[in-house]
Structure formats: structure tokens, C-alpha cells
Amino acid sequence: MLEIKGLTKKYKNADKNAIEDINLTIENGDIYGFIGPNGAGKSTTIKCLVGIHSFEKGSIMLDGLSIKDNPIEFKHQISYVPDNPDLYEFLTGMEYINFVSNVYDEDVSKEDIINLSKKFNLENNLLEPIRTYSHGMKQKIALIGALIHKPKLIVLDEPFVGLDPKAAFDLKEIIKELCQNGMMVFFSSHVLEVVEKFCNKIAIIKNGQIVSSGLTDDVKGDSSLEEAFLELYDKE
């Protein structure tokens, strides 16, 4: 279980907090959508969660492990894929996955890499340099790298951007399978229709604060998620 309590972050020289009193609970098996417009605080929350940003107040705990008190051990149990991941493009796909495995000090066999790559239909491209990959293929190799050490939590920032419909469908099926086995997924997206159909839980952030969170059906009520989202944003 991931628990975020009272998370507050203020950037240097800023007049106000970027995010304030963020409280979220993600349980094993959850596919948790995180939505809000540009500048609402999604990226700041995510960067605090994965240890890129420090924060002034609050706590982030994964199965009782604090990111502040045990940052290295915490990060070993999560993965993060940004919307435009930086990859070592001079490496082949196989070399990149082996590199990531070594960073996590994981003993991963060639068979493990090939089997995971097959789920993304990338097994025939593993020996090619990443610089020759399309955007969608680069997104796939980043996801394979994120999953190879079997994290408890994977954090995705706009994971479906640049993926063709087949690749997006395959990714959703893979995420469903992983979550059925107990992994947690937390992802931001501007595609509300995908979030509504795909996520069992949702949080909406506005002006750095969570304005609604919980089960998808509870957040949207009898309306569509788009209607519920717009209604919340029309309120001052």
C-alpha cells in the first residue's frame, strides 16, 4: 500500500505552495488515475512521489517504508516512466534492459527480458540500437526497463502518448495483468475517457489541492468523468 499524507511542496521564491496537503491511498491491485489541467500540480506530486523533488511537509510511505527515511530502499521498490523518457540511444534494447537491471542489482536472465519483451511485441528489435526505434518503440523499451525488476508500484506520466491504438491496447492489458498480481499503478493522463474506463480509482487535482478522490464511480457519480471534471473546475 502507498500512503501519501499531508504532502506539501513549495518551490524556491514562489509566492504559494505548488501542492498542499495532498492525501492519497493506493492499495495493491489499484489502477489509480491522476487528472488535472496543466499547472495543477500533477507533475510536482509525481516528482515528490518518486524522489526527484524534496518536500516541506507530509509523508510518503510504501508498505511502511518512508521515502525520506529510506530513500534508496523505497526507490528500489518503485519504477517511474515520464512522458518523454531519456534513453541511452546508443545502446541496443537488450543492452539498455541489462543496464537497468544492474542499476537495481537484479539478476535478470536473457529469457526474462525476451519474455517481457514479447508482451510488448518488441522481442525482434532487442538487438537494434534504440536510436533507430520509433517513438512508440522507445516508450515500450522504457516500460520494459521499468517493469524488469518487478516493482510494487509503477508511476506513469502520460503513458499512452505516442502509442498507436494497438500498442495502447496492449499496454492496458499488461497493466491489468500486473495489477491482478498485486502491483499498483499510478498514472497521470489528459485523456479522460481512458481514465474513466481503465482506472478503478481516480484523484482530481486543482490549484495544487485534491478536490475529489476515490472509486471511479463515486468520483464521477451518474455523469461522465468529463462532465464531473468540468463541473469541479467551474466551481471557484
Locations of regions flagged by a protein language model:
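A short, flexible loop at the N-terminus of ABC-type nucleotide-binding domains that lies
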Residues: 1-4, 8-21, 71
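Conserved ABC transporter NBD signature motif
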Residues: 58-69, 73-74
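Conserved ABC ATPase "signature" region
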Residues: 98, 102, 108-125
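Hydrophobic anchor residue at the start of the ABC signature
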Residues: 143
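Catalytic Walker B motif of ABC-type/P-loop ATPase nucleotide-binding domains
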Residues: 154-158
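ABC ATPase "signature
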Residues: 213-214
